[in-house]
């Protein structure tokens, strides 16, 4: 966000959201403008609410897919509507997809960047969630689409990168193995797998509490 925002610039952020996104926008001098993710509509983004909150100061839109904290997985149709809005208003798209490999019940995860080759998208992921090794603080961002639209942003990223003297070399050393080796995460998200069974247990336990419903 520091590479993108000037004081007073606005970024559309989902509500509810992973709070680090709101914090990042604020610390960079921007204003986080929250758009509704509606519980009554499977926690999907309210497209009309997004449209209403765009101003001449809006620089980008953040999506979290799969969403933290709601757990919603956005279908292709919803993502396409977001792309259409971003295209109309020339917005950058920041897509937090760190849970993209932890999708269960045969649902499909669609990366929004695949629907927006003409826009400038920044997609985020990392080993802590995708490979369930949270102790290794290593992640990445993928810049895709029309790089000309993100020229100033890319220059800002390069400047900020040059200010960092030390990377997490021990963690970086395992990236190749994690991405190219045996993908054990698939065993965790099917019936009998630890993540799947934990989800089932928590879902039942929450719904057994009077006045509480989990979806």
Model-identified regions with their sequence ranges:
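Conserved PLP-binding catalytic core of the aspartate aminotransferase-like
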Residues: 193-196, 211-215
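Hydrophobic/aromatic ligand-binding patch that stacks against planar heteroaromatic rings
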Residues: 3, 23-25, 85
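A short helix-loop-beta submotif of the ANL/AMP-binding
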Residues: 26-33
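Conserved core segment of the aminotransferase class I/II
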Residues: 114-193, 203-205
